[in-house]
């Protein structure tokens, strides 16, 4: 007999059914740039009365220094191909992004047209004009755009352009730069999710997420909507173990963001997945209950209700 104490039972009275829907729908935190956590936010440093030796302290702070060292990304225009439409031909450039400092098994690959780069340049000039005076954008050519020589030269120029942009801190953390590299794939992925095309959505998320996580390493919560979308797809494709693993990644991104709009819906989904998988969900349920006690008058949307509202424009 189903018990009301168990997720998914008819009498289940989880906080998802007891709170009020919030309407804030920004994908990233408000403001032009993403917040940048730093060493001052670390909570696991040695206390003032620590018994660690001098050498141990040196090793600890060396690890802390490495932990907060800025992640460097390398950009390469790996290849180019000519796309032919009914009334036009244009070149698609394959952009590969690799993280330095360690073996990167999740190199990110996207394709963009010259016109996409051009729109990015215009948006960045509008916002960061003076800071881009040393950044050279490849000039537009009226003829010969499809010649092998021109394509090869432009590949080198676009690679250098991305390198110079990334060197400007304000630019690499800007919404414009992030959207240029991730928004087309994410928008299509969330559109597929809304249409119930979960396999296709997962494929697109698999391409976009590694890059989004690299670009927002200073703000892990920025990747939470996409991670939760992957959870929803995997769950609805009846792949609960994989869905649970993705959910754990999302929860790690929110470990200091308990007021985040995805926090309670994600916990609720994880409780239900844990129960379905036969896992101990007591700790997850406890976190969910504590969150509900802090916000007794709120009703959260379900995780799926949240994700289908993303990237509507």
UniProtKB/Swiss-Prot annotation:
Q: Name one GO cellular component term.
A: early endosome membrane
One Pfam family cited in the UniProt record for this chain: PX
Keywords assigned by UniProt? Cell membrane, Cytoplasm, Endosome, Lipid-binding, Membrane, Nucleus, Phosphoprotein, Protein transport, Transport
Q: Where in the cell is it found?
A: Early endosome membrane; Cell membrane; Cytoplasm; Nucleus
Q: Which PROSITE patterns match?
A: PX
Task: Name a single GO biological process.
Answer: protein transport
Polar residues bias spans: 45-55
**Description of the deletion phenotype:** No visible phenotype. Mice appear healthy and normal. Neutrophils from mutant mice display unchanged Selplg-mediated cell-cell adhesion and Selplg expression at the cell membrane is unchanged.
**What topology does it adopt in the membrane?**
Peripheral membrane protein
MF-aspect GO terms: phosphatidylinositol-3-phosphate binding; phosphatidylinositol-4,5-bisphosphate binding
**Ligand binding (a 1,2-diacyl-sn-glycero-3-phospho-(1D-myo-inositol-3-phosphate)):** 113, 115, 140, 154
Q: Which residues carry this modification: Phosphoserine?
A: 3
Indicate the quaternary assembly. Answer: Interacts with SELPLG. Interaction with SELPLG is controversial and was not detected in PubMed:25882846.
Q: What is its biological role?
A: May play a role in cellular vesicle trafficking. Has been proposed to function as a sorting protein that targets SELPLG into endosomes, but has no effect on SELPLG internalization from the cell surface, nor on SELPLG-mediated cell-cell adhesion.
PANTHER family, sorted: SORTING NEXIN 20, 21, SORTING NEXIN-20
Q: Which family does it belong to?
A: Belongs to the sorting nexin family.
Q: What is known of its domains?
A: The PX domain binds phosphatidylinositol 3-phosphate which is necessary for localization to the endosomes.
User: What is this protein's name?
Assistant: Sorting nexin-20
Species whose genome carries this gene? Mus musculus
């Amino acid at each position: 007999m189903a018990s009301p104490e168990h997720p998914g039972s008819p009498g289940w009275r989880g906080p998802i059914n007891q709170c009020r829907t919030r309407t804030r729908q920004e994908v990233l935190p408000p403001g032009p740039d993403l917040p940048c956590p730093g060493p001052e936010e670390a909570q696991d440093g040695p206390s003032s009365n620590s018994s660690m030796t001098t050498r141990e302290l040196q090793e600890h702070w060396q690890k802390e220094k490495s932990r907060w060292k800025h992640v460097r990304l390398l950009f390469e225009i790996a290849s180019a191909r000519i796309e032919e439409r009914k009334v036009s031909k244009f070149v698609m450039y394959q952009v590969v992004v690799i993280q330095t400092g360690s073996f990167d098994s999740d190199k990110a690959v996207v394709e963009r047209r010259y016109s996409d780069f051009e729109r990015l340049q215009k948006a960045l000039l509008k916002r960061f004009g003076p800071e881009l005076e040393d950044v050279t954008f490849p000039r537009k050519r009226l003829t010969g755009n499809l010649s092998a020589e021109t394509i090869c030269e432009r590949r080198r120029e676009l690679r250098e352009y991305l390198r110079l942009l990334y060197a400007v801190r304000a630019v690499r953390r800007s919404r414009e730069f992030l959207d240029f590299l991730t928004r087309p794939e994410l928008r299509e992925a969330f559109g597929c999710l809304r249409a119930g095309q979960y396999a296709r959505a997962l494929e697109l998320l698999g391409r976009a997420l590694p890059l989004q996580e690299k670009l927002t390493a200073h703000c892990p919560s920025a990747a939470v909507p996409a991670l939760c979308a992957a959870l929803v797809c995997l769950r609805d494709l009846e792949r609960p173990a994989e869905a649970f693993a993705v959910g754990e990644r999302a929860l790690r991104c929110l470990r200091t963001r308990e007021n985040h709009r995805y926090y309670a819906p994600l916990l609720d989904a994880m409780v239900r997945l844990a129960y379905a998988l036969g896992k101990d969900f007591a700790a997850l349920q406890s976190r969910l209950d504590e969150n509900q006690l802090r916000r007794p008058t709120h009703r959260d949307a379900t995780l799926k209700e949240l994700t289908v509202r993303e990237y509507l424009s």
